[in-house]
Amino acid sequence: MTLPTDPAANLAALIRCASVTPAEGGALGALETMLKPLGFLVDRPVFSEDGTPDIENLYARRSGNGPHLMFAGHTDVVPVGDEAAWTHPPFAAEIANGEMYGRGAVDMKGGIACFVAAIARHVENNGGPKGSVSLLITGDEEGPAINGTVKLLEWAASRGEKWDASIVGEPTNPDTLGDMIKIGRRGSLSGSITVNGRQGHAAYPQLADNPVRGLMGLVDALLHPVFDKGTKDFQPTNLEVTSIDVGNPATNVIPAKATATFNIRFNDTWTAETVQAEIHNRLDQAAKRKKYRPGKKTPVDYDLVWRDRPSHVFLTRDDKLVDTLAGSIKAAVGKEPTLSTSGGTSDARFIKDYCPVVEFGLVGKTMHMVDERVALADLETLTRIYQRFIEDWFGQG
């Protein structure tokens, strides 16, 4: 029996599945075909929720006596954009100049392909890990992330699954393989502020109440002063205004409403609840000020709506997990990886509630771009890193 020990062949099979979120596109089926010869039992539960597409997921486990390691990731990919702009077709897995092209090559079908190859080599050389290995793979990471990892974890846990550690195979390296392990993530929270004014003629502002003026004062209060100066493990908390809309095409009309949307990435100085309280306090205080609304006697009339669910800040302090992975990276590429909490959120934010989790995968330079691609040499190196990690974490090195 031929085992899936070649990461490039594994990746090609996955790229050729057009699994643009939320479509499964055959990617989970291709993955199941790779895993079954390795002794994995595979389930593919489908989760639903009103107003969202049904999502197929995959949970596979190879059982043994000992600790339980989970590899997590996703097979769904972002849209390709203008397909004519691609040098090579986005779902053909063509190779040129030592690189494989295709949507999902680095984010993150490549990571999955390498982990499968690493397990296959370990089975071939050592008979398998002294413990259990599972793959928790969703088709809903690039989408709303409602019917994916969060529900798959709940589903598996309800069936008695427990994990001792997890690696998420997201592309964590900025420039070269081995640059960075993600050992935590900042929290994330989004909201919208709508200021209610009174529409009127721009030439007669005394007869109107310009909501844009009120909104300027509220936004200013969100941006100043800074929330903090950062901590030992995290960057400073940062708030970005991501949109401002008045829905007003006329230049001589004061609008009736103005809305600003914002996102805040917060460090371990805060919780989602304390960030929300701070923002409420800043807005309430700013609403009373007259700086942008001279002559107005009443506070700014505003509504604040929190959007989506917050992502909570976390930091993984599991020395065995972090040190074993860092040691595997150094053995393969000869350098110490940076331990970082930078960047955006990932599905690790859900996994951290079940077991210690870190993230490590390929180089992310071309993710989500036209001509997304990965060096074949990086696929081989990442496979060797994962294989060394599996051997050492299970005490078989």
Swiss-Prot record:
GO molecular function, one term: zinc ion binding
One protein family per Pfam: M20_dimer
Disulfide bonds listed in the record: none
Co-factor remark: Binds 2 Zn(2+) or Co(2+) ions per subunit.
GO biological process terms held by the UniProt record: diaminopimelate biosynthetic process; L-arginine biosynthetic process; lysine biosynthetic process via diaminopimelate
Obligatory cofactor(s): Zn(2+); Co(2+)
Keywords noted in UniProt: Amino-acid biosynthesis, Cobalt, Diaminopimelate biosynthesis, Hydrolase, Lysine biosynthesis, Metal-binding, Zinc
Active site residues per record: 76, 141 (proton acceptor)
Pathway: Amino-acid biosynthesis; L-lysine biosynthesis via DAP pathway; LL-2,6-diaminopimelate from (S)-tetrahydrodipicolinate (succinylase route): step 3/3
EC numbers on record: 3.5.1.18
Catalysed reactions, semicolon-separated: N-succinyl-(2S,6S)-2,6-diaminopimelate + H2O = (2S,6S)-2,6-diaminopimelate + succinate
Binding site for Zn(2+) 1: 74, 107, 170
Reported function: Catalyzes the hydrolysis of N-succinyl-L,L-diaminopimelic acid (SDAP), forming succinate and LL-2,6-diaminopimelate (DAP), an intermediate involved in the bacterial biosynthesis of lysine and meso-diaminopimelic acid, an essential component of bacterial cell walls.
Quaternary structure annotation from Swiss-Prot or TrEMBL: Homodimer.
HAMAP family named among the record's database cross-references: DapE
PANTHER family (UniProt xref): ACETYLORNITHINE DEACETYLASE (PTHR43808), N-ACETYL-L-CITRULLINE DEACETYLASE (PTHR43808:SF31)
Name this polypeptide is given: Succinyl-diaminopimelate desuccinylase
Organism: Mesorhizobium japonicum (strain LMG 29417 / CECT 9101 / MAFF 303099)
